[in-house]
Amino acid sequence: MKHILTGLLFILVCTVSFGQETYLSVGRNFTTYDFTNSSGESNLNVQNSSGASYEVGYAMKINPKLGLAIGVTLNQYNATGGDFVNNYSWDTNYLGAQGVLKFNVFKENSSRWGYNNSKFGLSLNAGLNVNHIINGQQKINGQTYDLTENDEFKGFYAQPMLGFDIRCQIINDIAVGLGYHYSKNFGLSNTTDQKLNFNNNQLQFNLIITLN
């Protein structure tokens, strides 16, 4: 995990030379496993859980109202479960590439809403993430199993998302912000009768650097 985070920070430094804005996001995923067995039945004993979220990348302006953010993500999609006899937990890490279109409802330093030098901005977002498990464990009553070769977890996932973020300019070239996205992560490679998708609510804290 430390090596992965170091790599994400390295990508952040590299994007300074290429993008109009570069950003770092950290947050929390609140995930529900959408699992069906070979009979098409869901497992009611699987409960939602939370995990960390990291993203680095850069954003480009397409026109005054529309922008594109391209980033690398590391997301944990976790769950717990069990009954009177057994206890389960799933802890996973997925590495992905993400593109998000951002529609600016209003931007900082604009005159909208009568504020001549507003420090606040709001954007509505729609995007797609393509990701793959890099490590994961399932624990059953103290026994640990590797999920990276499990048919339901391995392979590529496609994750469409919708959300919004707000930002506040704190000094000339630096802004901070908060974001929320809802997404569903669909498994693309699983050919078995058992299917697993992830429903995810994500909260993010964003640090944005404007490039000259």
Question: Which sequence ranges carry the predicted segments?
Answer:
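Sec-dependent N-terminal signal peptides
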Residues: I4-C14
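Short glycine/proline- and aromatic-enriched beta-strand/turn motifs that initiate or cap beta-hairpins
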Residues: G19-K61, I208-N212
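Residues that define the transmembrane beta-barrel architecture of outer-membrane proteins
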Residues: Q20, N48-A52, S89-A97, F120, ...
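Gram-negative (and chloroplast) outer-membrane scaffold detector with strong preference
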Residues: R28, A59-G142, N201-N212
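Predominantly the C-terminal beta-signal and adjacent terminal strand-loop region
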Residues: Q76-G81, Y157-N212
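Outer-membrane beta-barrel translocator domains and adjoining extracellular loop/strand segments
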Residues: D34-E41, T80-N86, I134-T144, S189-K195
